[in-house]
UniProtKB/Swiss-Prot annotation:
It comes from the Bacteria. InterPro entries: UDG_fam1, Ura-DNA_Glyclase_AS, Uracil-DNA_glycosylase-like, Uracil-DNA_glycosylase-like_sf. Belongs to the uracil-DNA glycosylase (UDG) superfamily. UNG family. This is Uracil-DNA glycosylase. GO terms for biological process: base-excision repair, AP site formation via deaminated base removal. The gene is ung.
Length: 220
């Protein structure tokens, strides 16, 4: 099993998935602003093929401000100020792996190296966090994690916050590395996200299993 088409292609034919697409399409039709733009909803899968995934960073739902979300969890488009959670990720990276903090929040270089930046819900209405939380996306992303868990081995799952941890509770810890910490949001980062050293631990694990490490440094 090499591609997302192999792993989750059948989901497209399922009634629940048809319902999601129909719902989002309808919302856009009546003039609601939905993020990310239609052509970027599935960017995480386009940028990181199933067989190339090394690390999964699980987010919740997309950023709901203008020009932020582009289909990768925690990432924002070039030219947009990094949001607070990402600022804390950068802080941890700088302490953990000597990361130089860039002026942007565009994480596409991670995705190209095999970091699947996956939100558990893939769309949101402008200004309304979690507005699409119950339209079926969770079923789809559960299937994504299930297939990675089953058909890949020696992946690293970074689960930050209770939502991500609950989502990843069925991951087989004998075949994969699961690292948990509080969410990097300013509300919780000081409770153990800062100092978690997940980025160096990820590379330690990959290296010990003969997998090329992630170069976390982003273009400045």
């Amino acid at each position: 099993m090499n591609s997302w088409t192999d792993a989750i292609g059948e989901e497209k034919t399922q009634p629940y998935f048809q319902h999601i697409l129909q719902y989002v399409h309808q919302e856009r039709l009546v003039g609601k602003v939905i993020y990310p733009p239609q052509n970027e909803v599935f960017s995480a899968f386009a940028l990181t093929e199933f067989k190339d995934v090394k690390v999964v960073i699980l987010g919740q739902d997309p950023y709901h401000g203008p020009n932020q979300a582009h289909g990768l969890s925690f990432s924002v488009k070039p030219g947009i100020v990094p949001p607070p959670s990402l600022v804390n990720m950068y802080k941890e990276l700088s302490q953990d792996v000597g990361f130089q903090i860039p002026s942007h929040g565009y994480l596409i270089e991670w995705a190209k190296q095999g970091v699947l930046l996956l939100n558990t819900v893939l769309t949101v209405e402008q200004g309304k966090a979690h507005s699409h939380a119950n339209i079926g996306w969770e079923t789809f992303t559960d299937k994504v994690i299930h297939q990675l868990n089953l058909h890949r081995e020696n992946l690293v799952f970074l689960l930050w916050g209770s939502h991500a941890q609950k989502k990843g509770q069925f991951i087989d810890r004998s075949r994969h590395c699961v690292l948990t910490a509080p969410h990097p949001s300013p509300l919780s980062a000081h409770r153990g996200f800062l100092g978690c050293r997940h980025f160096s631990k990820t590379n330690d694990y990959l290296r010990s299993h003969g997998v090329e490490e992630i170069n976390w440094q982003l273009p400045l």
